[in-house]
From Swiss-Prot:
One of its GO terms (molecular function) is GTP binding. InterPro entries: P-loop_NTPase (IPR027417), RapZ-like (IPR005337), RapZ-like_N (IPR053930), RapZ_C (IPR053931). Pfam families: PapZ_C (PF22740), RapZ-like_N (PF03668). HAMAP family: RapZ_like. Belongs to the RapZ-like family. It comes from Streptococcus pneumoniae (strain JJA). Keywords: ATP-binding, GTP-binding, Nucleotide-binding. This is Nucleotide-binding protein SPJ_1472. Displays ATPase and GTPase activities. GTP binds at D63, M64, R65, S66. Disulfide bonds: none annotated.
Length: 296
């Protein structure tokens, strides 16, 4: 049996340079992440990792918050070099001293190495101690001029493989306004102005995924006209959402009860967007009325 390859990114660098944003970015890229991993525990942790998927990916922040960081990190890295089945890279985040001082002042935090309270002294000492590690790093990112969003984009470009680069996902869902707008929706569209199958006895207990209801909703001229305008609005903006580093875009279609019109529209939208994007389909309230009837 072929041993599975373990991919590891060790995130380190200057305090205040953006390691928290970085580890969140790796999580969005599908990595298992841990913040503030003590260096001495790293080799043992990697041995204990239960590999359940092919090509598992890890991203761990290892920095000077661990008191033994400077004394242990070199020996740990040497050990990792000799570990079979491990592909690891070091990501070092840096920023100009002036910018780091400004960030510390903004958060009103003290630098962990500033014994006398002077932030700049702590930064200079940390930079000196981290110089060997920076020289060993395969990826050095200067975050001085980067916003958190720009840093996420930079890391995605550097560390995404082809599959991850396409990890932008669209969630299309239907819902009923009577039960509230989904709190995680990015785009919300209201189709309550369309003819309602609820008032037809033969369609009332069916849903928009059923062909008779779907055809009833979508075959109305106003439905087709609105849908084409909707598609023309949504399709051009999807690349911009992806470019901005958004990992999931949730599009919610709403009608009164979330059983007929919104379900049909969500189904149609999924069919079209799936031609070029990764799309998931969901119907929050589709069966809610049925569940209510069964309980009564």
């Amino acid at each position: 049996m072929t041993k599975k390859q373990l991919h590891l990114v060790i995130v380190t660098g200057m305090s205040g340079a953006g390691k928290t944003v970085a580890i969140q970015s790796f999580e969005d890229l599908g990595c298992f992440t841990i913040d503030n991993m003590p260096p001495a525990l790293l080799p043992k942790f990697l041995q204990l990792v239960e590999i359940k998927e092919d090509n598992p990916k890890l991203a761990l922040v290892v920095d000077m918050r661990s008191r033994s960081f400077f004394s242990e990190i070199q020996a740990v890295l040497d050990e990792l070099e000799n570990q079979d089945g491990l592909d690891f890279k070091i990501l070092f985040l840096d920023a100009a001293d002036k910018e780091l001082v400004a960030r510390y002042k903004e958060t009103r935090r003290s630098h962990p190495l500033a014994a006398d309270g002077r932030i700049l002294d702590g930064i200079k000492l940390e930079r000196e101690l981290l110089a060997p590690l920076k020289n060993m790093s395969q990826n050095v990112v200067d975050t001085t001029e980067l916003t958190p969003r720009e840093l996420r984009k930079t890391l995605a470009e550097q560390f995404s493989d082809q599959e991850q680069a396409q990890s932008f996902r669209i969630e299309v869902m239907s819902f009923g306004f009577k039960y509230g707008i989904p709190i995680d929706a990015d785009l919300v569209f209201d189709v309550r102005f369309l003819p309602n199958p609820y008032y037809l006895p033969e369609l009332r207990n069916q849903t928009g995924v059923d062909e008779p209801v779907y055809d009833y909703v979508m075959n109305h001229p106003e439905s087709e006209d609105f849908y084409q305008h909707l598609l023309a609005l949504i399709e051009p903006i999807l690349p911009s959402y992806q470019k901005e580093g958004k990992s999931v875009l949730t599009i919610a279609m709403g009608c009164t009860g979330g059983q007929h019109r919104s379900v049909a529209f969500a189904k149609r939208l999924v069919q079209d967007l799936s031609k070029n994007w990764s799309v998931n389909e969901g119907h929050r309230d589709k069966d809610r009325r049925k569940e209510t009837v069964n309980r009564s």
